[in-house]
Amino acid sequence: MDEFHRYGKEDSSWQQCFLYPLFFQEDLYAIYHDHYLDGSSSSESMEHLSSNDQFSFLTVKRLIGQIRQQNNSIVFFLNCDPNPLVDRNKSFYYESVLEGLTLVLEVPFSIRSKYSVEGMNEWKSFRSIHSIFPFLEDKFPHSNYILDTRIPYSIHPEILVRTFRRWIRDAPSLHPLRSVLYKYRNSPDNFQKSIIIDPRVNTRFLLFLWNHYVYGCESILVPLLKRSFHPRSLSHGSFPDQTHFDRKIKHIIRNYRRNSLKSIWSLKDPRIHYVRYAERSIIAIKGTHLLVKKCRYHLPIFRQFYFHLWSEPYRVCSHQLSKNCSSSLGYFLRVRMKPLLVRTKMLDELFITDLITDEFDPIVPIVPIIGLLAREKLCDISGRPISKLYWTSLTDDDILDRFDRIWKNIFHYYSGSLDRDGLYRIKYILSLSCAKTLACKHKSTIRVVRKELGPELFKKDFSKEREFYFPAFSSKAAARSQRERIWHSDIPQINPLANSWQKIQDLKS
């Protein structure tokens, strides 16, 4: 594999003309087989590989030999034989060749994505960007609108073939891909003319198609956004005196040379931040409402012209960050931009400058969180804790661990908020729901359960968390940290409530 990558880096045309012979090389499949046995792949685990009962490298090897002999009995694209046994064999061959085709196509795709991403200033477009807003305190104070876009699932197979043809000139390798795509489209599970690509389905071929499609979209969209919105020169904070800022900018423009107008005018360009996870992409913009309306208008047009795909306008939602709540992965973001007046006095006391800036104040959105807890049967819609009857068959340690994991994720995410009343309420709901679940399991009362467990009902609380964050701090520094907003930026796992949040989003769409 290292040799493949080295050849692909030295000669860009090499990766476009060698694919078709690889379909008949047993060594490549053996390389991937050893690769998964060693456990060196981060995107696929051996458990997932073994869970697919229809795939076998030995079957692929035998199938390659039959293809070399031009045995037409294994043509898996036809559905003319009514014999169910033959249909099962065709389906078996089809799934095997499908996996082998995916393995071969991933080689040039990984090479191309690796070096093109390096040229995009570390924009990681090949995989989904797992971002749950810990970076917002540094980035989003300069943004006031959010565009929430859902990437459509339905894609015509010919569009996927054309996107592959943009960077693969090996025509023979595209023919089996086109046949497989049309076979998948005509399967009994899919009655539409388009392919329904669902990244939540644990299929290697679908995940590869989804990543390739989104990568092709972002490789064009992200550089356009960066060139259009990213400031190219001085930052907005370079001018300490921001009183009548627009008037001063106009005065500077009249006196500066023509070649410096663009660099100065770029100070007024809006800032933009792009985040994607799975089928949702979030674009944060600093600008006016008119600019947001233009973005909502141009994003569907961009998909329509570049990918020949009609994207419904309702899939692009816009809302103001200070008035509405944004959500991703089961986490909710709501901020409050408070005006902060800073008075600057010069050393010679000639004049005093007033600086008016916005202070980033994250808020714990208690109502959406209670809605997710109610959907998970941890409380009712009014926030009253109830017992989780589905968990009564588990052991006491498993019940405590599940409630503790939910609480730790919520606390780690929302601990940056200065207002802790919402967090205390969520902790009360979870602790009482845990006590009711244990009491229902042992046919006891909540008082007995709380008396037996005591402080172990939840292992983490606010004071222990702060000691964990600042173990080397003095007591004075620890007391000061209680007043500061500290974001826990290392959250290794997804919020357990994300599945419920995804179901709510699917119902809305």
UniProtKB/Swiss-Prot annotation:
One of its GO terms (biological process) is RNA splicing. The keyword tRNA processing applies. Keywords: Chloroplast, mRNA processing, Plastid, RNA-binding, tRNA processing. It comes from the Eukaryota. InterPro entries: Domain_X, Maturase_MatK, Maturase_MatK_N. Pfam families: Intron_maturas2, MatK_N. Its main location: plastid. One of its GO terms (cellular component) is chloroplast. It is found in: Plastid, Chloroplast. One of its GO terms (molecular function) is RNA binding. The keyword ATP-binding does not apply. Usually encoded in the trnK tRNA gene intron. Probably assists in splicing its own and other chloroplast group II introns. HAMAP family: MatK (MF_01390). Belongs to the intron maturase 2 family. MatK subfamily. This is Maturase K. The lineage of its organism: Eukaryota, Viridiplantae, Streptophyta, Embryophyta, Tracheophyta.
